From Swiss-Prot:
Main subcellular location of this protein, as a coarse class: membrane
Annotated GO CC locations: membrane; septin ring
Sequence intervals crossing the membrane: 2-22
Protein name from the UniProt record: Uncharacterized protein MG397
Organism of origin: Mycoplasma genitalium (strain ATCC 33530 / DSM 19775 / NCTC 10195 / G37) (Mycoplasmoides genitalium)
Length: 566
């Protein structure tokens, strides 16, 4: 009994250890079983038919890829058999009692897992082999979607702008043909018939592009047609305005001529209307070359008639108001021209422009008198001559305006040249005057060469100023040539004078500093006396050089005596 009690804990420990070992093996077997079931489910859910079908449909002939498809089908049969066998084995291994057959279960479940892994690897290899077929299938549909989008835009454009106005049967036939081509291409994609698919795609591309070009050109001509129609309405309205305004614009005694003009315009408008009707027919027949030529002719005809009608309905009262404004400003214009002529009486180009202006003024005055004579004639008015005089007067006024603008611009430019001449001349004279005052005020001893340059430049400037009163143009040209030389001379004189002033100023500053040490040494005092004499003789370069040498010696002696230089 005592021995049993002693061995009891040991027995319990052994039993507990065996229980833990059994639980560990059971847990490991459950994990292997779960992993194998997951792999089985993934393989079971994968459909190998979707891999074989595109590859099988891609062939153009039934026997072309027969051997390859045979291999794929053999693998599919093997794949299905393996999956079914795995299901049967998993059913056996999933029984509760079998999981406790540790060695047998572990060996068989690992073998099944290995077989399924090998099956999965083989399946991925075949999927990679047939991947290009699937990619081709998807890209074909992407291309088809692109053309469908273009077709939708074209269909919408035709329905909105063209199909109701023009040959709807033509566009309906084209749209139906394109729809049938889409169906054919879809069938080729499904059947993987590459050659037919490419042929249908090329045909679709050509028809679609030609239809887009045709619709676009037809729409543009439709816009031009609307534009021309609008111009015709404006022309017809202007004809009606002519009839309403005949009592004001055209004398009643010339009514027969007015009606003749209106009838001629009306006939031409009717011809243009008939031409527009033919243009609609040409647009419907899509003869773009003839349409372009017809529209070009029509536009020229409309422009020509518009000018004619504008001439007929010209507002004579407004024209008279313009003439009155001109007559009011004519005296001021003449005064201005005389003032410019007086200022520039020796200028040939100004004189020629003034002659041209006077000729235009005389022509305008003559035309105004003729216009007044035509307007006062109550019995008979020659409107052809009246319109001709109005046109001539307008041209003369425009020419007068341009000539006057040219004259004013020329005068302004010459005034600018004159101001430049006077300002530059006075500026040179004033600067030389300032330099002379500076020399006098500072009592500078300037070199004879510098004084000679100053006197020569002043004399030359005075001569130019005097000569300008007699021959301004020649003097201006001469002065323009000498500006650079005068500027160089002025710069040299300024440099000479300023350098003297600066030297004297530096000498003064050096004397102020050196005088502080005059009592330190008799040598310093004697040196300063000599330098002062040089300074009084205005020998500033030698004075400054001597002062610099003296200050250098003072600085050296101060350092040797250990004195602090102030």
């Amino acid at each position: 009994m005592l021995v049993f009690l002693i061995l009891l804990p040991f027995l319990l420990l052994v039993i507990f250890g065996a229980y833990l070992l059994v639980c560990l093996f059971v847990r490991q077997n459950n994990l292997l079983l779960k992993k194998t079931k997951q792999l089985y489910n993934n393989l079971k859910l994968s459909n190998f038919n979707c891999v074989i079908s595109p590859f099988q449909l891609l062939r153009n002939e039934k026997q072309a890829l027969e051997q390859s498809i045979k291999v794929l089908k053999q693998f599919q049969i093997k794949f299905d058999n393996e999956i079914n066998s795995a299901f049967e084995q998993l059913t056996v291994y999933s029984k509760p009692n079998n999981i406790y057959r540790f060695i047998w279960f572990n060996r068989n479940i690992k073998l099944l897992n290995k077989n399924l892994q090998h099956l999965y690897t083989k399946q991925q290899e075949y999927i990679n082999l047939t991947k290009n077929a699937i990619v081709y299938f998807n890209n074909s549909y992407d291309c088809l979607v692109f053309y469908r989008q273009a077709f939708c835009f074209l269909n919408q454009f035709i329905n909105n702008f063209l199909i109701e106005k023009y040959d709807s049967l033509f566009y309906l036939n084209v749209l139906n043909r394109i729809s049938l081509l889409f169906k054919e291409i879809e069938n080729c994609i499904q059947a993987k018939d590459v050659e037919k698919q490419i042929a249908f795609l090329n045909k679709l591309h050509n028809i679609l592009s030609q239809t887009i070009i045709t619709a676009n050109r037809q729409y543009m001509f439709d816009i031009k047609l609307s534009y021309l129609t609008h111009h015709f309405k404006v022309l017809i309205q202007k004809v009606k305005q002519m009839e309403l305004m005949k009592n004001k614009v055209i004398n009643s005694q010339d009514l027969l001529k007015l009606h003749e003009l209106i009838n001629n315009i009306t006939i031409k408008l009717k011809d243009c209307t008939n031409f527009l009707n033919n243009l609609n027919l040409m647009l419907c027949e899509r003869n773009m070359d003839e349409v372009q030529e017809a529209i070009s002719w029509l536009f020229q005809a409309v422009s020509s008639k518009e000018k004619s009608i504008n001439l007929v309905v010209e507002n004579i009262d407004d024209f008279r108001n313009q003439i009155q404004q001109y007559e009011k400003k004519n005296e001021l214009l003449k005064t201005t021209i005389k003032a410019i002529e007086l200022v520039f009486q020796n200028e040939t180009d100004v004189h020629d422009l003034i002659i041209e202006l006077n000729e235009n003024c005389d022509l305008i005055t003559k035309n105004i008198n003729n216009l007044n004579h035509q307007s006062l004639a109550q019995n008979q008015i020659n409107y052809e001559k009246l319109f001709y005089l109005m046109s001539q007067t307008n041209q003369a006024l425009e020419k007068l305006k341009n000539s006057l603008t040219d004259l004013l611009n020329l005068a302004v430019n010459k005034f600018d040249d004159y101001r430049f001449f006077v300002y530059t001349l006075d500026d040179f004279r004033f600067k030389f005057f300032q330099i002379e005052n500076l020399i006098s005020d500072q009592d500078l001893k300037v070199p004879a060469k510098t004084l000679q340059v100053i006197n020569k430049s002043k004399l030359e400037l005075d001569n130019i100023f005097t000569e300008a009163n007699n021959n301004y143009l020649g003097t201006f040209n001469l002065f323009s040539e000498k500006i650079d030389l005068l500027q160089i001379q002025l710069t040299e004189v300024i440099c000479d004078v300023v350098s003297l002033v600066n030297l004297r100023l530096m000498c003064k500053q050096a004397f102020l500093f050196a005088n502080k040490y005059r009592q330190k040494s008799s040598h310093i005092d004697r040196s300063l006396e000599q330098l002062t004499k040089l300074y009084n003789r205005q020998n500033y370069p030698d004075t400054l050089e001597g002062l610099i040498n003296l200050l250098t010696k003072i600085k050296t002696n101060t350092k040797q005596d250990y004195l602090e230089l102030n």
